[in-house]
Structure formats: structure tokens, C-alpha cells
Design a protein with these regions (language model features):
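Conserved, structured C-terminal
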Residues: 1-269
Length: 269
């Protein structure tokens, strides 16, 4: 394996600790920073403003019973496309931390949400669900995730799958392998498309499959994600999706369907 630039230059040592039995809650939405800030022990405004998407830190909060929580690992991010925080909590405090947030915010500002709500949000945000939109046979290039492959990796290679992936990054017109299929978003007319539905061209020929789909509460339209034959992947392309034996009109659409609102140092629009 070819060493990366970081390895060549002697990167710093990394230590980690496995947090066994911890729970996780995701505080998501435009009021999440305000709600978390109200219960933090330390002054929250400056700390949270400097905590950008993808960063994390340990914080303590004031619990309902007047006690102070153990250090909680708070990461700014989530699986909804909204600003928010994923909070890792020791098992013994998972319930009281959740109740503290709920009661402090009140039902008009914060409510519990299940997997159905999370799934529709992540699909609106164009996020993949492993085992559905991704599996161990999918490459980052096919999945429209080439941005995860850093410049250093592209130059040195040597990572698992690099021979195939680096070849796919170069289009066929420039001597590369390109890809045969690409992950795309779709707006579907009529009934919502579900996983496994076939995507066909105007001749009725199969050109792809749906991997996720649902009605979008935000848009009031049916959104879907899937893989389509290279060449049909451009935004605005008209196709059809076979739903319960009937062909429904669909249009290839850029993702995210709903603009993401991650905190990057400026107020989300």
C-alpha cells in the first residue's frame, strides 16, 4: 500500500475510548442551538456559534432535578439536512437528559420524532441509507460521493478499491473507465415510488431502480432516489417509474431536494 502524505510526514498519534452502552439522541431543527443553549452549564452562545457542522465537544447540562449531567459528547450534525446536534449520553442519564430538553423547550418547540420522520428528512436532504442506497458493491463515484475522496488519496492511491475508483473518476472520453450507473434524485408524479421500483425510458426499457422513495412533507411532492444508466442522469431528464404495474412520469432532479441548513458560521437561510 502506498503511504499517504500524512503518513509520510509522521502524523500525530490518535487515542480513542470506546463508550460502551451509551445512548444517542438527535436534536434537530432551526431551534436546536437555542434549546441546547438554554440548559448548558457553561455560557452557550459563544460556544455554539464556534461549533461548526462536523465538530464535537463534551458539554454538561442542567438536569430537571437540579443536578448537573455527566459530560455529554455533542456533535454538530445529523441525518436530516437541518442544523442540529447528535448527543451521546451515558445509559443511566439518557431518559433524564431527553426529558430535560423536552420540558425546557415545551411541545410547541420540541417533540419526539420516529424513524419515519427521520427517513423522510434524510431523503429530502439527499442522504443515503446504507443497505438501500449504498452497499459494499457501490463505489463513491457511482453514488455521487466523489467529494469524500481527498486530493491526497487521488494522487497516491493505495486505499481499498483505489484501482477501480480512480479509474471511474476519469471519464471514458479521457481514457478512464467512467461508470455504468449513477445515483440520482427523482420527482415522481402520482403515487410515491418505493424501493425496488423500476426506472424505464420512453421505450419501456429498464434503465435503473429506485432505492428509496416517499412523499415529501416539505415539498408536497413524491421524491425518490435511485440508480440510473449513465447518460440518463442529467437533471431535467424525463423518465418513467413502474409503480404497481403502472408507469408514472418522473423527472431527474438535483439533490438535495430541500436545501441543507448546516451551521457553517453564518445563519442558515
Amino acid at each position: 500500500m502506498v503511504p499517504t502524505k500524512h503518513q509520510k510526514e509522521g502524523g500525530a498519534k490518535v487515542e480513542w475510548e470506546v463508550l460502551e452502552g451509551w445512548g444517542l439522541i438527535a436534536l434537530q431543527g432551526p431551534l436546536s442551538a437555542d434549546i441546547l443553549g438554554r440548559v448548558m452549564v457553561e455560557p452557550a452562545e459563544s460556544e455554539l456559534k464556534e461549533m461548526y457542522f462536523g465538530s464535537s465537544k463534551f458539554v454538561k447540562i442542567k438536569l430537571l432535578n437540579g443536578e448537573v449531567s455527566s459530560p455529554l459528547l455533542v456533535s454538530r450534525g445529523g441525518y436530516t439536512g437541518e442544523d442540529g446536534f447528535e448527543i451521546s449520553i451515558p445509559e443511566s442519564e439518557a431518559v433524564v437528559v431527553t426529558e430535560t430538553l423536552l420540558q425546557n423547550a415545551g411541545p410547541e418547540q420540541l417533540q419526539l420524532a420516529g424513524l419515519g420522520a427521520r427517513d423522510s428528512l434524510r431523503l429530502e436532504a439527499g442522504m443515503c441509507l446504507y443497505g438501500h442506497d449504498l452497499d459494499d458493491s457501490t463505489t463513491p463515484v457511482e453514488a455521487a460521493l466523489s467529494w469524500v475522496i481527498g486530493k491526497d488519496r487521488r494522487e497516491t492511491g493505495g486505499f481499498h478499491g483505489s484501482e477501480i475508483i480512480l479509474s471511474q473518476l476519469k471519464p471514458k472520453s479521457k481514457g478512464g473507465a467512467g461508470v455504468e450507473r449513477r445515483r440520482i434524485g427523482l420527482i415522481v408524479e402520482g403515487a410515491p415510488a418505493r424501493e425496488g421500483a423500476e426506472i424505464v425510458n420512453d421505450k419501456g426499457e429498464k434503465i435503473g431502480n429506485i432505492t428509496s422513495g416517499c412523499p415529501s412533507p416539505t415539498l408536497g411532492k413524491n421524491v425518490a432516489m435511485g440508480y440510473i444508466k449513465d447518460g440518463f442522469h442529467k437533471s431535467g431528464t424525463d423518465v418513467e417509474v413502474v409503480i404497481r404495474g403502472k408507469k408514472r412520469k418522473a423527472k431527474v432532479t438535483k439533490m438535495p431536494f430541500v436545501p441543507s441548513k448546516y451551521w457553517k458560521g453564518t445563519a442558515p437561510s
